[in-house]
Amino acid sequence: MRVFYAHPASCSLKETRLLALELKAALAAKNPTQVVRVRPGRDDHQNNFKGDWDQWQCDVVLRSNVTTGSPVYDVFVVIGESCGRATANILNFALQQGRPVFWWDGKNPGKFKKVHTIQESDCEDWTNGWTIHLGPPPLQQLALPF
């Protein structure tokens, strides 16, 4: 299982690597017959970013292995209650493509929950302006004409 770990940009390199190892251990405990590989978003960005943010975000979801043709990532995992613009775009695109996206509580063995939507809550906050929803999207009251 190949996992894209969507961590906060504010995490230090050390913290990101530690959490990626914890995520790998948590997923391996839940899937003992599978080899688990976790790649933090920062590592993917450093290795694959070619100067265009929108293209890189789509590429994370659509990129395939040159040899096998299979998607580079089988699953996408996010941590926290909110995320930034790039993470929101990646995860929303993954959801649109029917790819599995899960929220993780950051612990081992930890809890995993399916992400249903990611909605903009503050468009001016590019680091935390999107809210991760684990249940069906919240209902919105339509404006009445009177």
What spans do the regions from the language model cover?
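Conserved catalytic or regulatory cores that recognize and/or transform ribose-phosphate-containing ligands
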Residues: 1-146
